[in-house]
């Protein structure tokens, strides 16, 4: 094999590795698609991918809601919290992964906050108790959220053995965080259907005392 041929084969192999994908579909106990479920793909026994710098995200406040309500970001991401409402908000979190409080404000008063620890961060507003949001922070570069069909495709996953974690605030308590093992092939995609054993918890209504009770 010539050096040029070896180089071409190496480049092709690298391209194939980058093209690998993980397709996850999540359904509930009634076989209905689960929207907005967090899906994270983590390598098993391998070194974690180096952290990237300059990662940014935005969680707006619109119509007394966090938009998006559920976010998933990589550790080290800077998140901005603009207030697009005509009323002021006071965003806070008591979660160990990010404990903070932004004093009463409107517009874009504060610089972005860096979410530098992995874990689940629950957001609230001291003025409007019905406002609840979630930020899932992960060390893995491979993550996403399911769409209205309960599907998410996570691309550029190298071949190997992985642990797939799933989370959603409406998962039943005994399925609060689901884990599955998955092997990603050298070529082609890896498919992972996940069917919940329990029904999703009810969608929270406008009653602030019942909004995501337990979070």
List the model feature ranges, each with a label.
Residues 4-5, 23:
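Generic extreme N-terminus detector
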Residues 5-16:
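Bacterial N-terminal signal peptides
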Residues 19-215:
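Extracytoplasmic copper-binding redox domains, predominantly the cupredoxin/blue-copper superfamily
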């Amino acid at each position: 094999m010539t050096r040029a041929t070896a180089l071409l084969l190496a480049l092709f192999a690298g391209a194939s590795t980058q093209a690998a994908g993980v397709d996850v579909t999540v359904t509930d106990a009634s076989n209905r698609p689960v929207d907005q479920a967090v899906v994270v793909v983590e390598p098993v026994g391998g070194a974690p991918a180096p952290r990237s710098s300059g990662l940014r995200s935005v969680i707006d406040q619109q119509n007394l809601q966090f938009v998006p309500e559920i976010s998933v970001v990589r550790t080290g991401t800077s998140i901005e919290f603009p207030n697009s409402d005509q009323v002021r908000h006071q965003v806070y979190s008591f979660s160990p992964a990010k404990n903070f409080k932004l004093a009463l404000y409107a517009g874009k008063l504060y610089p972005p906050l860096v979410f530098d620890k992995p874990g689940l961060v629950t957001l609230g507003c001291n003025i409007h108790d019905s406002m609840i949001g979630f930020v899932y922070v992960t060390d893995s570069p491979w993550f996403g959220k399911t769409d209205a069909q309960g599907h998410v495709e996570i691309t550029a996953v190298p071949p190997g053995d992985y642990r797939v974690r799933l989370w959603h605030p409406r998962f039943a308590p005994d399925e609060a965080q689901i884990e599955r093992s998955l092997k990603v092939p050298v070529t082609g995609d890896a498919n992972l259907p996940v069917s919940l054993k329990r029904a999703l918890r009810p969608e929270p209504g406008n009653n602030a005392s019942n909004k995501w009770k337990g979070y």
